[in-house]
């Protein structure tokens, strides 16, 4: 009788274990990537960059020099929110498979701007360069974020200059490499790695 009990218990354990195994879950579908680099730049980076650039300024006019900087917690928080876009946008811009622009997109000024196909060739030819340039934007935005957290308008002003240089460096390489005026201005500002 005891042997029958042990056989019955062992059989139930085997059956129970077999029922407990899960079938392998199907692979999750790939995330959609409908946005192009141009879409991300137009809808996220440019508006956030404009907000940040306009947050700290020295305005010189007939009344003298006026400094503009965040003063209230809400103003600092507004700058902070837009900086997070600039910190995270490089991750989106450099995603493998992200296209430069839509097939129907065209350059507004083809004498100085690359067409989307030309930008795509540059991206495809040297992906590490894109990642390096995007990282410069990210690093500069992180510095600006630290300045905002410290509510240090002077450090923010300095960090914004770094953001501007990171943007211009990338644009001179991919978007408007034939713009001689922009190249000369970049050299005067110390931007030489484009």
For each feature predicted by the language model, list its residue ranges:
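Sequence context surrounding c-type heme c attachment/ligation sites in exported
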Residues: 20-80, 84-87, 91-194
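Bacterial N-terminal signal peptides that target proteins for export
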Residues: 1-8
């Amino acid at each position: 009788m005891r042997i029958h009990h042990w056989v019955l218990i062992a059989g139930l354990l085997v059956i129970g274990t077999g029922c407990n195994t899960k079938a392998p879950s199907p692979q999750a579908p790939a995330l959609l990537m409908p946005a192009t680099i141009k879409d991300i730049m137009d809808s996220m980076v440019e508006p956030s960059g404009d907000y940040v650039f306009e947050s700290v300024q020295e305005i010189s006019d007939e009344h003298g020099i006026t400094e503009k900087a965040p003063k209230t917690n809400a103003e600092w928080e507004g700058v902070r929110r837009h900086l997070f876009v600039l910190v995270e946008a490089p991750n989106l811009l450099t995603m493998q498979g992200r296209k430069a622009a839509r097939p129907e997109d065209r350059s507004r000024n083809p004498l100085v701007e690359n067409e989307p196909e030309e930008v795509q060739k540059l991206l495809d030819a040297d992906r590490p360069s894109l990642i390096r340039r995007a990282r410069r934007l990210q690093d500069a935005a992180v510095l600006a974020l630290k300045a905002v957290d410290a509510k240090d308008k002077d450090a923010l002003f300095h960090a914004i200059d770094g953001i501007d240089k990171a943007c211009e460096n990338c644009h001179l390489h991919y978007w408007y490499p034939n713009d001689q005026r922009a190249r000369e201005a970049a050299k005067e500002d110390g931007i030489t790695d484009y």
